UniProtKB/Swiss-Prot annotation:
Pfam families with a match to the protein in the record: Lactamase_B_2
InterPro entries per the UniProt record, alphabetical: Metallo-B-lactamas, PQQ_synth_PqqB, RibonucZ/Hydroxyglut_hydro
Species this chain originates from: Ruegeria pomeroyi (strain ATCC 700808 / DSM 15171 / DSS-3) (Silicibacter pomeroyi)
Signal peptide (UniProt feature, chain positions): none
Pathway: Cofactor biosynthesis; pyrroloquinoline quinone biosynthesis
Function: May be involved in the transport of PQQ or its precursor to the periplasm, in association with PQQ biosynthesis, but is not absolutely required for this synthesis.
Family, as annotated: Belongs to the PqqB family.
Protein name, entry field: Coenzyme PQQ synthesis protein B
Length: 295
């Protein structure tokens, strides 16, 4: 199995269009590697590929990876797209894939309802793009030789669907993780997770590689930096640090581990930071656009 990180950043990317924080400023100045928004490509054979989350940057992300280029006049090696929630940074890129080339669109019924509720996604011609609802805990083929299974993780509804009160620990079809298997190796992709319950730890025990939500280092990172008014947990993302952060909660896993979906404010972007060094000591790497993982 081969996994290619198309985008390592959280919503907005790095640099974010309206942000002058030190990370964004350094990314603009060439002192820090820019990053597109959260997306993966995965393949069992290096020929047919599936996209996990279609970010707003998907056209450029596919252009940057020759394995995703058309092999003829019209067409694509992309057999399917899977989305793990209804967030803008995971579904907006679907609109760039509307050019009459067939692929399967996998998501839970709940996430498909989000797409059905916005007619702009009717631009994906239904005679070309098959919308395939997937039940939780039910394995299915993303493409030949590559099996996926969706499972619920704690999260919330998309920002544009929030009401006056928001439950950030919902467990259901609105936020899912993905188990990937080629019959020999297993990887997990969880770009959004509000907290790590014990049953999730048990599930991940067979992971060969884990790509996990690395949105914020500190829960109040955006508030302290002056770039936002919400904590990570309010946004449905567990922080990396802290006594019940993901670094502590996932410490016992034997898998190789990669943080992905990283906010522009996160200090782990900086190779020389104390936070990056701490991750390395704990057996984690930080994703970057173009990172290749082979299992």
């Amino acid at each position: 199995m081969k996994i290619v990180v198309l985008g390592a950043a959280a919503g907005g990317g790095l640099p974010q269009w309206n942000c002058g924080c030190v990370n964004c400023s350094d990314a603009r100045a060439g002192r820090l590697r820019p990053s597109g928004q959260s997306s993966l490509a995965v393949s069992a054979d290096g020929s047919r590929w599936s996209i996990l989350n279609a970010s707003p940057d998907i056209r450029q992300q596919m252009q940057d990876r020759s394995v995703l280029h058309p092999q003829g006049l019209r067409g694509s090696p992309v057999a399917s797209v899977l989305v793990t929630n209804g967030d803008i940074d995971h579904i907006a890129g679907l609109l760039s894939l509307r050019e009459q080339t067939p692929f399967d669109l996998f998501a839970t019924a709940g996430i498909h309802e989000v797409l059905e509720g916005n007619r702009i996604f009717d631009a994906l011609a239904r005679d070309k793009v098959a919308r395939r609802p997937v039940a939780l805990e039910s394995p299915f083929a993303l493409h030949d030789g590559l099996e996926a299974m969706l499972f619920a993780v704690p999260g919330k509804v998309p920002l544009f669907m929030e009401g006056e009160s928001v439950d950030t620990g919902l467990i259901g079809e609105q936020t899912v993780g993905v188990r990937l298997s080629d019959g020999r190796n297993t990887a997990y992709y969880i770009p959004g997770c509000a907290y790590v319950p014990d049953d999730l730890l048990h599930r991940l025990s067979d992971a060969g590689h884990l790509l996990f939500d690395g949105t914020l280092w500190d829960d109040d990172e955006m508030i302290r930096s002056g770039t936002g008014i919400k904590t990570g947990r309010r946004m449905g993302h567990i922080p990396i640090s802290g006594p019940d952060g993901s670094l502590v909660r996932l410490a016992g896993l034997a898998a190789d581990k990669t943080y992905i979906h990283i906010n522009n404010t996160n200090p782990v972007w900086r190779a020389g930071s104390a936070e990056r060094a701490e991750l390395a000591r704990r057996g984690w790497q930080v994703a970057h656009d173009g990172l290749e993982i082979v299992l």
